[in-house]
């Protein structure tokens, strides 16, 4: 508006009236008095002025202390590229662990659909918190998360959200060269949620101490199966020695498989219906263990069976031991590790369990003491369960937190 609004306020004017001036009257003349002879007055005693001592000097004003420097605590912030099974569960794990997610990128999922897919999960159930799309952002438990739909990592504005640590969970950008576009776009570090052909590979509880902040800004969290096998193999090898071994994972079907028979160029039987078949498949998990435990190079290999279950898988490690040991000694060694240095990573159970008992379990590997067997003191079969989705996603977040702690 070009004119100002004028607000009129009623003002009461009070008129002050002066009191009329009093009339001055002359006093009556005094009556005459008899003359009295004046009496001599005593001389006044001189009054000595008391001299007060000067007040003590004021103490010097204390110097103002310099202002204290308030250090701002660094905070781990995370960006997620790829909002598929692992991407969404990494976000859930971050919310559970109090890790701040600042951005999600997925060119194939509309923001409103992100809300739906994150809120409802056929395997892990409905998200217990609040989730909505508001003011152009994904809002989870009142935490605002920027949403992007960039097709290439170099297009994602990571700098605009504070240069977070990025989880590369598309399954596409697996090499250092491909993932380096995240760094160019402003990401501080990148964790690939899959095996990588050339990025340093880490398994929490096994070799995370080898992480070098000065030279490693792109790393791999290996595979879910490697995260299950490696902690168990580490305990057995360090205590008894593994001469050689074969690993088999009985693995739930994944999104890359077919619901009904379809084409598969890489391996023909991979294209058969996932819900109808037990499908032999290849896996690099056993060989990947040799990257995190170099002493086992050339001693392990393995394969997989894809089975018609939606989640939770199990590793069968059959190996020959260098030091003879009864099965009871193996159980005690694993139990001690689960209670000690590998707590939270490796677990131990003697219950009569089945696969669904581990749905939502956040451990990397749960040793089933009653399922294993020994042929003799040198040749054993060891069984360990894992939630190949949820447990793995928690390890991704744990690796992010560990890297952040080392980067300080």
UniProtKB/Swiss-Prot annotation:
Top-level lineage group: Eukaryota
BP GO annotations: flagellated sperm motility; glucose metabolic process; glycolytic process; positive regulation of glycolytic process
GO cellular component entries: cytosol; nucleus
Cleavable signal peptide: none
Residues at which NAD(+) binds? 85-86, 106, 151, 173, 193, 388
Q: Provide the alphabetized UniProt keywords.
A: Cytoplasm, Glycolysis, NAD, Oxidoreductase
Which Pfam families does its entry note? Gp_dh_C (PF02800), Gp_dh_N (PF00044)
Q: Where in the cell is it found?
A: Cytoplasm
EC numbers: 1.2.1.12
What residues does the record give for site: Activates thiol group during catalysis? Answer: 251
Biased composition (Pro residues) is annotated at 53-68
Which InterPro entries does the record cross-reference, listed alphabetically?
A: GlycerAld/Erythrose_P_DH, GlycerAld_3-P_DH_AS, GlycerAld_3-P_DH_cat, GlycerAld_3-P_DH_NAD(P)-bd, Glyceraldehyde-3-P_DH_1, NAD(P)-bd_dom_sf
The record places the active site at: 224 (nucleophile)
Annotated metabolic or biological route of this protein = Carbohydrate degradation; glycolysis; pyruvate from D-glyceraldehyde 3-phosphate: step 1/5
Record's catalysed reaction(s): D-glyceraldehyde 3-phosphate + phosphate + NAD(+) = (2R)-3-phospho-glyceroyl phosphate + NADH + H(+)
Q: Where is this region: Testis-specific N-terminal extension?
A: 1-73
- Relate the protein's function as given in its record: May play an important role in regulating the switch between different pathways for energy production during spermiogenesis and in the spermatozoon. Required for sperm motility and male fertility.
On assembly, the entry states: Homotetramer. Interacts with ARRB2; the interaction is detected in the nucleus upon OR1D2 stimulation.
What is the UniProt domain comment for this protein?
The testis-specific N-terminal extension mediates tight association with the cytoskeletal fibrous sheath of the spermatozoa flagellum, possibly via interchain disulfide-bonding of Cys-21 with sheath components.
Its recorded name reads Glyceraldehyde-3-phosphate dehydrogenase, testis-specific
Taxon lineage: Eukaryota, Metazoa, Chordata, Craniata, Vertebrata
Name the gene behind this protein.
Answer: GAPDHS
